Design a protein with these regions (language model features):
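Membrane-proximal, proline-rich intrinsically disordered regions
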Residues: 1-51, 55-58, 70
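Structured, solvent-exposed acidic/aromatic patches
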Residues: 10-14, 45-199
């Protein structure tokens, strides 16, 4: 009776993907992962506020935690949810895209932090608040396996839910490639090659 339409308890999978992509863009492309590392490599200099402190190598645990939380709690958790929903609805293209996004997040985290949690990382709702860490080498193997699954999903002939919006006037469900599966497959292969160089 008193249901707030602006607070859904279950988000349709089509609407998870734009949220995943937007939060990935912020965490990977516009936050600590890029700003701090580029300041430290002297590609540019921090001259004001937080960037000034980072330019003086004064980084706090909050700065690092922000990146960690922005990847695990947002896009990666949503990727797990999207993969599950896509598999339930026979929509392997959505599952494949979510797996490419998951692999991208994992690759970013392991490149920055080395050993990270994955197998137990999404069990917080089940009470596991201290997931086991896996070695960076194992994470690269996991990334490769996830991307293999993604490629198989993206090559699937059967897909119950289209990646494109029904009305061309609506914003796309896929902000990155607008539902172009071939581009997602190419991205998966490119990521496989990129992370194979780290093994």
């Amino acid at each position: 009776m008193n249901i707030d339409p602006d607070k859904p308890s279950d988000v349709p999978m089509e609407y998870l993907l734009p949220s995943i992509q937007a939060s990935m863009a912020y965490a990977i492309g516009g936050n600590t992962a890029v700003r701090t590392t580029n300041i430290w490599m002297q590609y540019f200099d921090g001259v004001d506020r937080q960037s000034l402190a980072e330019g003086r190598y004064n980084i706090t645990s909050a700065d690092v935690n922000d990146l960690w939380e922005n990847l695990y709690a947002q896009p990666m958790m949503d990727c797990k949810s999207l993969i599950s929903k896509a598999e339930d609805k026979n929509s392997p293209h959505y599952a494949g895209v979510a797996k490419v996004c998951m692999a991208t997040c994992l690759g970013t985290l392991t490149n920055l932090f080395g050993d990270i949690p994955y197998s137990e990382a999404f069990l917080g709702n089940e009470g596991n608040l201290q997931p086991a860490y896996e070695s960076q080498e194992d994470i690269y193997g996991i990334i490769d396996a996830i991307l293999e699954e993604a490629i198989a999903d993206l090559n699937s002939e059967e897909n119950a839910v289209a990646m494109s919006t029904p009305d061309p006037n609506d914003p796309p469900f896929d902000y990155i490639f607008d539902g172009d599966i071939d581009l997602w497959i190419k991205t998966a292969y490119a990521l496989k090659a990129r992370y194979a160089l780290n093994i």
